Regions:
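Intrinsic low-complexity/disordered segments
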Residues: 5, 28-29, 33
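Bacterial N-terminal signal peptides
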Residues: 12-28
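N-terminal secretory signal peptides that target proteins for export/translocation
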Residues: 1-11
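Noncatalytic, solvent-exposed loop/strand surfaces
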Residues: 32-570
Length: 570
């Protein structure tokens, strides 16, 4: 966490000067922004929802759609609320003791991943550690059912204690898909056993209790694909029709040096109805740096269906969504790190992709990051043209032994000058612009590593980095407009609702800004404990999960205040 005792903000004029110093650049030959009306990203979300059997104002997957742009239009969304008095709170409910899974809302239900600290299921009291996916009624907040994932016997190398479910489910009709803490891709019946049916083909649940989940099918990636996730299996899936896209979380061993399963898949495409694996890819291979905890995006770009995955090697990969002849078909790949950057357990300058790639107006946006426990570090945010093919990185690495042939990627450092390596500009580069790099100005406002993703509206891009700096840039050029220091780490992705931007931090504060090229902070609300998740809006209700509680917020609401064990109002 940064030790700065003050909050920073810089005007657009200062940032325009600082951009060159901080590493911002715009690739030559790329069409510049015009005076035409900016894309309406909320229409993309609505169009995506129209393809699913969910309500038109539901929020049925991570970041709302396969485009992964957390932008929405809504009414009655408050600027202020008070979780201690219940002002503008419709309801709140207990979660586990640690919550890293984001809430989603579909067809009258709210789903959120956490641990078992709330103890909703009698056969697993709250002193039993589980990965828990919990389903609540969206209107009342009443508990409906929980999918209970017992801890893996291998322990923290695969299933870190108390972390619970870190992924976010996707819902379509009466089906739900998510990645469990046990390394399983799971399809559930969204009704659970409340419909008095045990949906199959899987019918081996331990019981048919109405407070537990009804599993339709599941794929054990550790058993069937020999995947070895590092610490936690975390991927928030997305779909294109009947295709389900998954990142496996395959990573290093407990010593953080070796990869136990470097030939196992990193990326999957599955039939979401049957659980059949349609194609796999293991491109990151032995070059995975740590874990693989990003989530896929999907879009039709340049007339081609593309499934886009952030790799644990720091590369972004795009594949033909449907594959070819039962195999993965790579369209392009992009190294998101400078070639001379180096990976180390502490103080690395090379990073992998943790946040989710975002698609906006035909371009792809992604930032690099790292497990927050591995300290802070410099970051890089990229805008990429997805219509090019092959290796579309900004530069290529060669070696003096064969100076005309690019060398293969290397794990810890791509370009080692002492070994005769050198760089050349890539004439096939798809980089539109880059933002970040070393903090030469030493004002702590450079782009740091990021766990979250960007949100974009009206060509204004917002992203919070792990060090707690909230950045606003021009989405077309990468020009910085302003930055604000939140004085606390942030793992969250911003939410843009109407002309407001919401972002949370690990101190438990939600800051609200005007969606503007001029920095205007409107409000800051304390949530009583850390907010590692991202705010969402569904059906004119703002949902925020802090470390141990889920809140449904709406202008004019008043939750009943109860004094039970010091709990917040509900």
């Amino acid at each position: 966490m940064l030790s700065s005792p003050f909050r920073h903000s810089l005007c657009g004029v200062c940032w325009a000067i600082a951009a060159l110093v901080m590493g911002g650049w715009l690739a030559g030959g790329v069409p510049q922004a015009t005076a035409q009306e900016p894309l309406d990203p909320t229409k993309q979300v609505r169009d995506s929802a129209d393809q699913l059997k969910i309500g038109g104002k539901d929020w049925g997957q991570w970041l709302g759609s396969p485009y992964r742009n957390n932008v929405v239009v809504a009414e009655k969304i408050p600027l202020e609320w008070d979780v201690t008095t219940g002002k503008n709170v419709r309801w709140s409910v207990k979660l586990g003791s640690e919550t890293y899974g984001n809430p989603v809302v579909a067809n009258g239900k709210v789903y959120v991943g956490t641990n078992n600290g709330a103890g909703y299921v009698p056969r697993f009291p709250n002193n039993v550690d589980l990965g828990a996916l919990i389903c609540f009624d969206a209107e009342s907040g009443n508990f409906l059912w929980q999918h209970c994932n017992e801890k893996l016997p291998t322990g923290r190398v695969h299933d870190w204690p108390d972390q619970g479910i870190c992924s976010v489910p996707m819902i379509d009709g009466d089906r739900l898909w998510y990645v469990s803490s046990r390394g399983e891709v799971v399809c559930l019946d969204s009704e659970g056993f409340l419909d008095d049916e045990n949906d199959g083909p899987f019918t081996g649940e331990p019981n048919g209790n109405k407070d537990e989940a009804d599993v339709v099918w599941k794929l054990d990636m550790m058993k069937e694909l020999k995947v070895s996730q590092h610490n936690m299996c975390s991927c928030s899936v997305t779909c294109a029709g009947e295709l389900l896209f998954v990142i496996t979380s395959n990573g290093v061993d407990e010593g953080h040096v070796n990869l136990p399963a470097d030939a196992s898949p990193s990326f999957l495409c599955m039939d979401r109805n049957s659980g059949k694996v349609l194609w796999t890819d293991s491109s990151p291979g032995a070059n995975v740096l740590h874990g693989q905890w990003s989530s896929p995006a999907y879009g039709v770009l340049g007339g081609v269906e593309q499934a886009i995955f952030g790799g644990g090697d720091g590369w972004l990969y795009s594949f033909s969504a449907r594959g070819k002849d039962g195999k993965a078909e790579l369209l392009w790949k992009f190294d998101c790190n400078p070639k001379k950057s180096r990976y180390a357990l502490r103080g690395a300058t090379r990073n992998h992709v943790v946040g989710t790639p975002v698609i906006y107006d035909g371009l792809v946006y992604v930032a690099v990051g790292e497990d927050p426990e591995h300290l802070e570090g410099e970051g890089h945010l990229w805008c990429i043209d997805p219509t090019k093919r092959g290796d579309v990185s900004p530069t290529l690495v060669f070696n003096a032994a064969d100076p005309n042939k690019p060398i293969a990627p290397k794990r810890l450092q791509a370009c080692v000058e002492t070994e005769g390596d050198f760089e050349r500009d890539n004439t096939n580069s798809a980089a539109v612009w880059h933002y970040g790099g070393e903090d030469i100005e030493e004002n702590e406002l450079a782009m740091h590593r990021a766990v979250g993703s960007v949100a974009i509206k009206n060509n204004l891009l917002f992203i919070a980095d792990q060090s707690g700096v909230f950045h606003c840039l021009d989405a077309k050029t990468g020009k910085p407009h302003w930055a604000y220091h939140m004085e606390s780490e942030s793992w969250a992705s911003p939410l843009i609702v109407n002309d407001l931007v919401y972002i949370g931090d690990s101190d438990g504060e939600i800051a609200i800004f005007r969606c503007s090229a001029e920095m205007e902070k409107l409000s800051e609300v304390y949530m009583e404990s850390a907010c590692f998740t991202s705010p969402i809006v569904a059906n004119d209700t703002l949902y925020i999960a802090n470390r141990n509680r889920l809140y449904a917020l709406q202008e004019g609401a008043q939750a009943k205040v109860e004094e039970e064990d010091g709990e917040s109002p509900r």
